[in-house]
Amino acid sequence: MISFLRGTVAHVGLSSAVIDLNGAGMSVNATPQTLSGLRTGEEGKLFTSLIVREDSLTLFGFSSDDEREVFDVLLSVSGVGPRLALAVLAVHDPEAIRVAAHTGDGKAFTKVPGIGPKVAGRIVLELAGKLVPHGTGAAAAPAAAASAPWKPQVVAAMTSLGWSEKDATSSIDKALSDSPELEAGGQVAEILRATLRWLGQDGARAGNRVGSRG
């Protein structure tokens, strides 16, 4: 793995830079913020992540090791490739991403071009527990999120599947009234599955009630 590059900056473009390493030019993709810190002809250093594909090797560069760490974690989300992960870092700094993932703030991710509610919900769901804020940002989360940090994540996942926030919240509460042990465990995936099961059973009960009236 290429952990970082340090060399003379040969070129800075709109979405990438070229670092001269002893006569070899290494092309590195980066965010506008990272590129703005580089000056042609001067020494530059970028932390890097190498993406290996069957037909290509692509370097992505970052101004800090923290940015690279968040980038690599974002890549663990199904459907999120390196370009989209880089776009997230172009809109939010690493700490803001950590806070959004930790508090289940799916709306923060929809501010990124190319990310709609469905993908944002998936990001929040799959990053649960993987990104924890370093600073005080988590303290600014709503009190409800502090007492039940899993709840915004489950709500975001359900809204991405088509439910309104009000219906999602109500369904979660009703499902957990049948399975209180899940609330104590606070596992996002398990609570989401239990809520979806409850919705299916409630739909079946509603169908039975309609059938009995007919």
From Swiss-Prot:
Protein name: Holliday junction branch migration complex subunit RuvA
Origin: domain of life: Bacteria
Chain segments carrying region Domain III: 153-214
Disulfide bonds: none
Species assigned in the record: Arthrobacter sp. (strain FB24)
Keyword annotations: Cytoplasm, DNA damage, DNA recombination, DNA repair, DNA-binding
Any GO MF annotation of the entry: ATP binding
Function: The RuvA-RuvB-RuvC complex processes Holliday junction (HJ) DNA during genetic recombination and DNA repair, while the RuvA-RuvB complex plays an important role in the rescue of blocked DNA replication forks via replication fork reversal (RFR). RuvA specifically binds to HJ cruciform DNA, conferring on it an open structure. The RuvB hexamer acts as an ATP-dependent pump, pulling dsDNA into and through the RuvAB complex. HJ branch migration allows RuvC to scan DNA until it finds its consensus sequence, where it cleaves and resolves the cruciform DNA.
Assembly description: Homotetramer. Forms an RuvA(8)-RuvB(12)-Holliday junction (HJ) complex. HJ DNA is sandwiched between 2 RuvA tetramers; dsDNA enters through RuvA and exits via RuvB. An RuvB hexamer assembles on each DNA strand where it exits the tetramer. Each RuvB hexamer is contacted by two RuvA subunits (via domain III) on 2 adjacent RuvB subunits; this complex drives branch migration. In the full resolvosome a probable DNA-RuvA(4)-RuvB(12)-RuvC(2) complex forms which resolves the HJ.
Lineage: Bacteria, Bacillati, Actinomycetota, Actinomycetes, Micrococcales
Family of this protein: Belongs to the RuvA family.
